[in-house]
Amino acid sequence: MASQGTKRSYEQMETGGERQNATEIRASVGRMVGGIGRFYIQMCTELKLSDYEGRLIQNSITIERMVLSAFDERRNKYLEEHPSAGKDPKKTGGPIYKRRDGKWMRELILYDKEEIRRIWRQANNGEDATAGLTHLMIWHSNLNDATYQRTRALVRTGMDPRMCSLMQGSTLPRRSGAAGAAVKGVGTMVMELIRMIKRGINDRNFWRGENGRRTRIAYERMCNILKGKFQTAAQRAMMDQVRESRNPGNAEIEDLIFLARSALILRGSVAHKSCLPACVYGLAVASGYDFEREGYSLVGIDPFRLLQNSQVFSLIRPNENPAHKSQLVWMACHSAAFEDLRVSSFIRGTRVVPRGQLSTRGVQIASNENMETMDSSTLELRSRYWAIRTRSGGNTNQQRASAGQISVQPTFSVQRNLPFERATIMAAFTGNTEGRTSDMRTEIIRMMESARPEDVSFQGRGVFELSDEKATNPVVPSFDMSNEGSYFFGDNAEEYDN
């Protein structure tokens, strides 16, 4: 974090604030999640949900999606100009699950967007509270990251499916602002840029005229966001080349894919935040907790402590394993989809298994699924320890590159090695070092070749007991150095489809 002077912390991005001191940040983040909690309580009242139904994560997700849709100005405008059959542009809704005679029933509800906006503003002191909306988007994004694989999207843009660990935040909407940009992985940014360049190649007018100028500004802004994630001079210099290109084409796509591959070892800085479902904040507010007064942080002990004391339920399909469903949601809550499983398991206190071994599908239930056979169970979201979330890629020795793995983007600031299969990664870098970026490419490859899988990242950083809120006594775990921990290993998850 070389340029800390110019960066806002991500709590500031999250709350849209300018530079504040730690107490002000904690208060404004507290205000944000408190507003989400108040909104949730009000919605439960409107929908006449029982206490149990209000703690159902599927209901929480429906309510969150309704408010996000109510504030999606661009889409609302589009829907009004292109009326489609059976879609009322002024209404939003979704499935709400209720318990009737010992069975779960699905009820489709519909609300005026205007009404939802009113309830949201009322819960947020009359303000639009965009930060709270972004927070919900990031929670949905983290859930998608833990649930789905993006192989198809990676292949479509010419990237390698093994680069999945770079795809954090790939389902975040465009409108997620600075807080959203901070949590996007290198692969996500590369993919957005490649899509843009491809449109430019296929559509002559993409970069032309008044619209083209706006497109160009967006392109350069995205390039700068990606550049800011890289930690080595050579990677940044290559990003300058991509950004300054007169009319971006295949050469730029090549450079971007090269950079994405290099990020498997020379990892980018990607922020991690524990964003919890709205019902969790609702429960806390309902029990009388004053978030704004107490203060709150997305990257410290607070989310862990909140989850220790919250009981959340989930619908379970007939052949799903409730413990596996819990793991999925736990990972989503802590933005740990791309974390090393050794680290996650240690913090959680129970073994976290790779996704290929999970007997569970996604959290959301499709409208055609049979409710007759649905059961519900408690999600086990507690942890044994807590650890500080990181926004660095865990590169060792003074911001130079260190070992990475085909599948890790660290979430927790905890000492470990980042094992990786150098041969696998380096095989992707054969040949092509000519052209205007040749010296940078050579430099990047040299750094990658000198990286050692046994190097230790986050030297001396440990986890903390849940009673240690000031983080005074770090417990530095020792991991089996040979055993890599990829969540996506032997993957069989469903693809993410909008």
UniProtKB/Swiss-Prot annotation:
It comes from the Viruses. The keyword RNA-binding applies. A motif (Unconventional nuclear localization signal) lies at residues 1-18. Late in virus-infected cells, may be cleaved from a 56-kDa protein to a 53-kDa protein by a cellular caspase. This cleavage might be a marker for the onset of apoptosis in infected cells or have a specific function in virus host interaction. GO terms for molecular function: RNA binding; structural molecule activity. A motif (Bipartite nuclear localization signal) lies at residues 198-216. Keywords: Capsid protein, Helical capsid protein, Host nucleus, Host-virus interaction, Ribonucleoprotein, RNA-binding, Viral nucleoprotein, Viral penetration into host nucleus, Virion, Virus entry into host cell. InterPro entries: Flu_NP. GO terms for biological process: symbiont entry into host cell; viral penetration into host nucleus. Pfam families: Flu_NP (PF00506). It is found in: Virion; Host nucleus. GO terms for cellular component: helical viral capsid; host cell; host cell nucleus; ribonucleoprotein complex; viral nucleocapsid. Residues 1-21 are annotated as: Disordered. Its main location: virion. Disulfide bonds: none annotated. Encapsidates the negative strand viral RNA, protecting it from nucleases. The encapsidated genomic RNA is termed the ribonucleoprotein (RNP) and serves as template for transcription and replication. The RNP needs to be localized in the host nucleus to start an infectious cycle, but is too large to diffuse through the nuclear pore complex. NP comprises at least 2 nuclear localization signals that are responsible for the active RNP import into the nucleus through cellular importin alpha/beta pathway. Homomultimerizes to form the nucleocapsid. May bind host exportin-1/XPO1. Binds to viral genomic RNA. Protein-RNA contacts are mediated by a combination of electrostatic interactions between positively charged residues and the phosphate backbone and planar interactions between aromatic side chains and bases. HAMAP family: INFV_NCAP. Belongs to the influenza viruses nucleoprotein family. This is Nucleoprotein. The gene is NP.
